[in-house]
Amino acid sequence: ATWLRGNHEQDLIDALESQDGLSQHATYAQLGDSSARQWLPRLQQLPLVYRGDGWCATHAGFDAAGQPDLSIRDPFWEAYDGRFGQVVVGHTPRPQVERLGAIVLIDTGAVYGGCLSAYCPQTDAVVQVEGAATDAVLAGVGPC
């Protein structure tokens, strides 16, 4: 497994690098400044994109210029030209893993009561386990 930088990691990096530190971020402040700061070097090293043979993975998708966008929710796949091969993304929860052309959307809302999903580009296999949340608030979520 590869840990990719996503919008929450970037938000924490930005908070730790700002003059205000964690004081303006109640969620991150729970970590405690010294505890959070020890993670900063690792967070800064997280890749935005992981590239495999004929595929890549990124947290949320790509903007119109083909740059990784950590918080995009627009259907970027509608204009995707295939330049990166198959693209595996998360970020936007869906009731099930979806394949939209060369795009594979794997966020199945574990935090909202859905499954935690993993995808293998080499075999097209999907593995799912029950998420920790017990109340399925994501529309259409069923058992894994």
Residue ranges and their predicted role:
Residues A1-D20:
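Core catalytic region of metal-dependent phosphoesterases/phosphodiesterases
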